[in-house]
Design a protein with these regions (language model features):
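Conserved beta-strand -> loop -> alpha-helix junction used to position metal-binding or nucleic-acid-contacting
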Residues: 33, 82-131
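Mobile genetic element proteins and their domesticated derivatives, centered on retroelements
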Residues: 33, 46, 50, 79-82, ...
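Active-site beta-loop-alpha junctions of metal-dependent nucleic acid enzymes
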Residues: 52-80
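Two-metal-ion RNase H-like nuclease active-site motif
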Residues: 24-37
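Short, surface-exposed basic-aromatic patches at helix termini and helix-loop junctions that form
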Residues: 47-49, 69-74, 91-102
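Short, small-residue-biased leader/transition segments that mark boundaries at the very start
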Residues: 2-9
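Short, basic alpha-helical nucleic acid-contact segments in DNA-binding proteins
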Residues: 10-24
Length: 311
């Protein structure tokens, strides 16, 4: 029957893990981010303005996982990211020539998390306002004016932020305005490393515009993936991971026909066999890892009572 045929086809494709094609194409701008399926299962995703170009299943956003994703993709001119853990260490190793644009919206959110959207202290009101101004900067003159205003804020409130208070519980001195100090230090790191305004560098923009935010992947891809998972509540962790893999695959530039997918893509059995091999043999070194962290694949089928990570 037709229903039986549909179920057979569905079951057959559920056993497949679609892989990202390795094209060797060099992109001007690449966006990267991760979407968590559980506390320690995340799918890292890379895309351009037009297509998804890579994905990788991992335990966490550590440098090893990011390097595995990035190793499949030639270094782009610019990568737009939210500054997740482990990314910079991996970028230095795998994409050493790639410039970084830190998402300005995430930079603003990091400040807002410390000051709240209704800060009580005048220093917090001013810093929150400066962080909010980041979202509207579109030209070099505005960026220079912002840097000057931020430098003036740091000088104006330097003594205030240097105040310390004795913590009665620990007996140690701590910053009196600790949340403001944290917000300032975060912005200081972005400014000192020139990560906020890469999108305005004329040497880079001559090859095409560079977005200042990670909206393409956070709002354009992750939001759709979360909606898909909500619409299909009840899927096992394995099938949620596969659903994301399939969504990413059909949004690559040229997905293979169904017949070719069945011939070339790895199945659950293939990965089980690979995991058995790497459990007894050393890791291969002839190219980038293709599918995901070995422990992730194992835990999708057999939960382990302990946690292991690499970085």
């Amino acid at each position: 029957s037709l229903v039986g045929s549909e179920m057979c086809i569905r079951d057959r494709f559920w056993s497949i893990w679609p892989l990202a094609p390795i094209t060797g194409e060099v992109h001007h701008v690449v966006f990267v981010d991760g979407i968590y399926l559980a506390r320690n299962v995340v799918v890292l995703i890379a895309c351009t303005q037009e297509h998804v170009i890579g994905w990788y299943l991992a335990r966490s956003e550590n440098s090893r996982s990011w390097a595995a994703l990035m190793g499949k993709i030639p270094p782009p001119d610019v990568v737009v990211c939210d500054g997740g853990t482990g990314f910079e260490k991996a970028r230095k190793r795998v994409w050493p020539t790639t410039r970084v644009q830190r998402c300005t919206f995430h930079a603003f959110c990091q400040v807002r998390a410390q000051t709240t959207s209704r800060p009580k202290l005048q220093a917090g009101v001013e810093l929150y306002g400066l962080a909010k101004e980041l979202l509207a900067i579109k030209e070099v003159a505005s960026a220079l004016a912002w840097l000057e205003a931020y430098s003036a804020w740091c000088s104006r409130w330097e003594g205030f932020l240097a105040e310390r208070t004795l913590d009665e519980e620990s007996g140690r001195m701590r910053w009196t305005h600790e949340r403001l100090v944290t917000a300032r230090n975060g912005l200081n790191r972005l400014v000192s490393k020139n990560l906020l305004f890469t999108f305005l560098d004329p040497e880079l923009t001559c090859d095409g515009p560079i977005p200042s935010m990670n909206n393409k992947i956070e709002g354009g891809i992750n939001a759709q993936l979360r909606r898909m998972l909500r619409d299909h509540r009840g899927l096992s962790l394995m099938r949620r991971a596969k659903a994301i893999f399939w969504w990413c695959y059909v949004h690559t530039e040229v997905p293979l026909p169904a017949a070719e997918i069945l011939k070339t893509m790895p199945t659950d059995d293939d990965i089980e066999e690979l995991y058995r091999q790497v459990s007894t043999e050393s890791q291969r070194t002839d190219g980038p890892e293709e599918w995901g962290d070995g422990l992730v694949w194992a835990e999708l089928r057999h939960a382990l009572p302990w946690r292991v990570e690499w970085d």
